[in-house]
């Protein structure tokens, strides 16, 4: 089919975007990686993981690179030639031994809106503290992407950054939201076109809810302060696809409770509601 805007009979093809997802072995990162691969008519997917074991865990495909976000040089091969970067690396608190029945498990596998009972104690593994992963590691990714000429960076953060006393900062004494906010500001000041998605409380449930955007943690104390990982992953993919309405924007992302509202289908319209740059 010829392009309607020219006289040529040569077919017009939409150029695929090459998109790298870091943290591709994580719960949300892997969802984004898989969604990109499923839409091979629009995207060429790449993933970045920390180890050979993590690569095998998600299929061991040639489009999965191994790199350490604390080692900027190791990021260059994965960044080469990409159009967009989706940052989904994050420090992961784990439950302290002897602190409840889920000893050793990651907080994200246990704690969500349905959690009941006394809150256990948490810790971060050596070398995996929020200052290292959510600040220095994300800064390294932003710098590497900028050096590689990346045209768009989507950074997934968290709601709660406006409150220094938010309970997430107390987990393992990591101040995780403080460091996340610092990397968000660094990205906003980097000069690289960006989209910052501050997700609400993450739930390990099916997606397809009605999504809501906000700012300054206004959704956090409401019933819209939670969102499924699947919906966050979908928002990341859509943010890359509709970059014309997501670049240089930052927003909170929540959802109506499960079983209520109308599932969001028009992401371009949703993103067009956002006016905040940070």
Residues covered by each model-derived region:
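N-terminal chloroplast transit peptides
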Residues: 1-15
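N-terminal Rossmann NAD(P)H-binding glycine-rich loop of SDR-like oxidoreductase domains
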Residues: 13-42
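NAD(P)H-binding glycine-rich loop region in Rossmannoid oxidoreductase-like domains
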Residues: 19, 30, 47-148
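A short helix->loop->beta-strand "cap" motif at the edges of active sites that frequently abuts
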Residues: 41-43, 146-152, 181
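Non-catalytic, hydrophobic alpha-helical segments
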Residues: 85, 187, 197, 232-236, ...
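Substrate-positioning beta->alpha
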Residues: 137-138, 179, 197, 221-238
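Conserved beta-loop-beta element that borders a ligand/cofactor-binding pocket
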Residues: 152, 156-173, 182-211, 218-221, ...
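Alpha-helical substrate-binding/gating segment
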Residues: 228-250, 254-258, 262-278
């Amino acid at each position: 089919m010829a392009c309607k805007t020219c006289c040529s009979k040569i077919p017009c093809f939409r150029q695929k975007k090459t998109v790298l997802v870091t943290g591709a072995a994580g719960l949300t990162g892997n969802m984004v990686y898989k969604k990109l691969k499923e839409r091979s008519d629009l995207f060429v997917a790449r993933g970045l993981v920390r180890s050979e074991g993590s690569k095998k865990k998600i299929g061991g495909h040639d489009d999965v690179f191994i790199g350490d976000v604390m080692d900027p040089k190791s990021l260059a091969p994965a960044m080469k030639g990409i159009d967009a970067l989706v940052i989904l690396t994050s420090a992961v608190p784990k439950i302290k031994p002897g602190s409840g029945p889920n000893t050793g498990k990651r907080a994200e596998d246990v704690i969500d809106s349905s959690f009941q009972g006394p809150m256990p104690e948490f810790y971060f593994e050596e070398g995996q503290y929020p200052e290292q992963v959510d600040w220095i590691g994300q800064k390294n990714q932003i710098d590497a992407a900028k050096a590689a000429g990346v045209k768009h960076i989507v950074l997934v953060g968290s709601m709660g950054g406006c409150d220094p006393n938010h309970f997430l900062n107390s987990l393992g004494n990591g101040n995780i939201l403080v460091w996340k906010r610092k990397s968000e500001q660094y990205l906003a000041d980097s000069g690289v076109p960006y989209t910052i998605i501050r997700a609400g409380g993450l739930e390990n449930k099916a997606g397809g809810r009605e999504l809501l955007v906000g700012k300054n943690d206004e959704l956090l104390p409401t019933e819209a302060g939670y969102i499924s990982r699947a919906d966050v992953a979908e928002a990341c993919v859509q943010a890359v696809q509709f970059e014309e309405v997501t670049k240089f924007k930052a927003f909170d992302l929540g959802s109506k409770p499960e079983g209520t509202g109308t599932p969001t289908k028009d992401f371009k319209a949703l993103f067009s509601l956002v006016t905040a740059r940070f």
